[in-house]
Amino acid sequence: NSNAKKALATCLFRTDGYKESLELYDSILEEEKNNTDIYLSKGHLYKTSGDIDKAISSYKKCYEIDRYFGDSYWSLANLKTYKFTDKEIKNLTKMVLDENVSKNEKIFMHFALGKAFEDLKDYQSSFNNYHLANKLKKESSLFKYQDYIDDCNNQKTVCTKDLFSTKNEWGFTSDEPIFI
């Protein structure tokens, strides 16, 4: 079952079992040759293990399979050392204007363009793309600032000095920090 293999590969990757994880990813790709999520995961694995050239190849394989796979461009940008080619920038610029490209993919693409233009020292274009990415991301976010403020105010109302004084004897008495 490829879903079980994907889950196991992810667990192995997160626990430094890179070799075993890579073997599982490759076995999945034998069955699903165009699975962009697996190539993306392989790219992340290579990045984490320090093999940046293979990470770049894996990320590029994603957009060779699906040119609209925005996470591949964002992952390249997130390497911090990758420089987009003029052709990649041109293609990304066209795709973010395409009404058929999903909002989520455009978010990734705008972030990638932000980094690409920043590297070119075209700071206005960089800012514009970062701004658009953040705007689109905010529109799709479930986070509501007012809800956060209301929650904080509610905690202030409930967690009074009186509440804590009634619970003064509770808990552990050591002043040592607890790391969770």
Each model region followed by its residue ranges:
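Alpha-helical solenoid repeat scaffolds of the TPR/TPR-like class and their adjacent stem/linker regions
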Residues: 1-180
